[in-house]
Swiss-Prot record:
The keyword Cytoplasm applies. Residues 280-291 have a biased composition (Basic and acidic residues). Transmembrane segments: none annotated. The gene is prfA. This is Peptide chain release factor 1.
């Protein structure tokens, strides 16, 4: 019974209230912060649990009044409303009971690279960057370009962006994979549709404490920054290339004005990549059911097609097709795709958890 599953959460919440109101905890800032965070995480399910248990009590009370000559009709109406509310609350609680992705509240790095299709792929990277920027603005996130390499006719060969905001990872993690674009290039005189592809890698931003890097494992090179077409954009050796020797991961950053800033940004990206590598290894060891969840983030997985002549956008993971490509790209309306992905993910997770 669902009610019995809620009891431990209610007890723990009361226990946390007592602990946080004790005088001992005031002298231990670290413990107080940890307990406050746990309390905040429990609050949504506790509030919903109390509403659900109150609804169950009200149902029983109204059932007892059905034969009452004065209150019977009123109880019947009230019971109908409560019986409709009960399954809705149960579904909301089941979703709240699902295991949380520990990265969901983090900021997220988006690493976008042009793949097959040459210049057309680079141009689409540029278009997608603009669309993501509008999406970030819509949700109140901040977007920073960490590093970039421009395409020869515009757009980007590759770009790394950091999207900052509570829950940024929980939504944009579904963008990881291969994105295919079909459209007529401006240089195409015959009106033929060309197909190109780009890849998006998603990585949560991590703290220094979570990823420790031995300085002896790093090879740091400095060089002159190069601009569009390879020309030097300044006269100082401000560009930084960091190689993580054990894994072979290489990060180059030249977008900042100082060597220090570029090295700092490159280290953030390196830590995110190492964390992503560790997470991928951890997930690979888990059950096939766990791995089947939507959005593995594997950049080799073809997740979406953008067909401009048909104004169509299709997400292949959930067989979703919308004929609103222009609006989604122009206004950054990616929630029209992300929301169904989240719903699908939750449905799969509920099945796996037998909730």
């Amino acid at each position: 019974m669902l009610a019995s599953k809620l009891d431990p959460f209610l007890k723990r919440f009361e226990e946390l209230n007592s602990l946080l109101s004790s005088s001992d905890i005031l002298n231990d800032i670290s413990k107080m912060t940890t307990l406050s965070k746990e309390q905040k995480n429990l609050e949504p399910i506790v509030l919903k649990a109390k509403e659900y248990l109150k609804t169950l009590d009200n149902i029983e009370e109204n059932k007892a009044l059905l034969n009452d000559p004065e209150l019977g009709e009123l109880a019947k109406e009230e019971l109908k409303t409560l019986e409709e509310l009960k399954p809705k609350l149960e579904e909301e609680i089941k979703i709240l009971l699902l295991p949380k992705d520990p990265n969901d509240e983090r900021n997220i790095f988006l690493e976008i690279r042009a793949g097959t299709g040459g210049d057309e792929a680079s141009l689409f990277v540029g278009d997608l960057v603009k669309a993501y920027a509008r999406y970030a603005e819509n949700r109140g996130y901040k977007l920073e370009i960490v590093s970039s390499s421009e395409g020869s006719v515009g757009g980007f060969k590759e770009i790394i962006m950091l999207v900052k905001g509570t829950g940024a990872y929980s939504r944009l993690k579904y963008e990881g994979g291969t994105h295919r674009v079909q459209r007529v290039p401006q240089t195409e005189s015959q009106g033929r549709v060309h197909t190109s592809a780009i890849t998006v890698a998603v990585m949560p931003e991590v703290d220094d404490i979570e990823i420790e890097i031995n300085p002896n494992d790093l090879k740091v090179d400095v060089m002159r920054s190069s601009g569009h077409g390879g020309q030097s954009v300044n006269t100082t050796d401000s560009a930084v290339r960091i190689t993580h020797i054990p894994t072979g991961i290489v990060v180059v950053n030249q977008d900042g004005k100082s060597q220090h800033k570029n090295k700092e940004s490159a280290m953030k990206v390196l830590k995110a990549r190492l964390y992503e590598m560790q997470e991928s290894e951890r997930l690979a060891k888990e059950s096939e059911a766990r791995k089947s969840q939507v959005g593995s983030g594997d950049r080799s997985e073809r997740i979406r097609t953008y067909n401009f002549p048909q104004n169509r956008i299709s997400d292949h993971r959930i067989n979703l097709t919308l004929y609103r490509l222009d609006a989604i790209m122009q206004d950054g309306l990616f929630d029209e795709i992300i929301e169904p992905l989240i719903t699908h993910h939750q449905a799969q997770a509920l099945q796996e958890q037998n909730l």
